[in-house]
A protein has these predicted regions:
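Structured catalytic-domain cores with a bias toward divalent-metal coordination
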Residues: 1-248
Length: 248
């Protein structure tokens, strides 16, 4: 099937990058949000991947970069919508927040004529989440706070639980959603969504990145978007938790 993002039609079997307009800087430079679209040759669901809603969280950017190299339109059933950097302002300034100190991941679903946070959230909600069936949002810990690779999700939802099991992170946390987050909005719209946390801000962590790429591939396989892999000799189930705490 054909999918339309930012006014650009992408046919089956195609790979395209679309620049969604975000805003202009005070220098009149156009600022855009690149969306990587891999539209499979075969019919199937649409899966979104978002990263860097907080501009200083880098692991997800590299996860998406590596994942896009592994996924081919020839073998994909459905469509992959990937945004490596949602908070482009924060990324350029190595900041968690937007210039007005708003937290983008407390601004969903946003609105078309609101603050810059509301406008970016609205853009993601209407152009990406609205067209998707499933998704995953990639995050890291804050500066000087390192997160063990973990999945946060509503594990009472059987589809979400199936996705979390397939991802295979060391820990899966049955975590309540927070108001205004992307995961809350997507879940409310009926889009089963995982949140992957790994590592710390402003750092690349190779272990976390590899685990993220492998995990997303496994989720795409269990959703039958990618061909099944040979059975693993050893299958390690995640440890399930209902709460977390920081070790200082």
């Amino acid at each position: 099937k054909t999918i339309k993002v930012g006014g650009v039609q992408v046919g089956a079997g195609k790979r395209v990058t679309v620049d969604l307009p975000v805003a202009n800087l005070y220098t009149h430079t156009n600022l855009t949000m690149p969306v990587h679209i891999v539209n499979g040759r075969h019919d199937g669901p649409t899966f979104f991947i978002t990263s860097a809603l907080h501009g200083d969280e880098l692991n997800g950017i590299e996860i998406i970069k590596r994942l896009l190299k592994r996924v081919s339109p020839k073998s994909l059933h459905g469509c992959l919508l990937a945004i490596p950097i949602v908070n482009v302002f924060g990324f350029l300034n190595q900041s968690r927040y937007l210039p007005d100190r708003r937290d983008l991941n407390r601004s969903f679903p946003g609105r078309e004529t609101g603050s810059i946070a509301a406008r970016i959230a609205n853009l993601v909600a209407t152009e990406i989440i609205a067209q998707s069936n499933f998704g995953i949002d990639l995050h890291t810990g804050a500066i000087n706070r390192t997160n063990l690779p973990q999945i946060r999700a509503d594990l009472s939802n059987p589809v979400v639980r199936k996705m979390a099991d397939a991802f295979g992170a060391p820990v899966a946390i049955d975590a309540a959603v927070r108001d205004g987050t992307l995961r809350q909005y997507a879940s409310r719209e009926g889009k089963p969504t995982l949140l992957y946390e790994c590592g710390e801000a402003l750092r690349f962590d190779e272990l976390s990145i590899k685990a993220g790429v492998r995990g997303i591939v496994r989720v795409l396989r269990v959703l039958e978007m990618l061909p099944a892999a040979p059975p693993a000799k050893i299958v390690v189930a995640p440890t399930y938790a209902n709460s977390t705490t920081w070790v200082r």
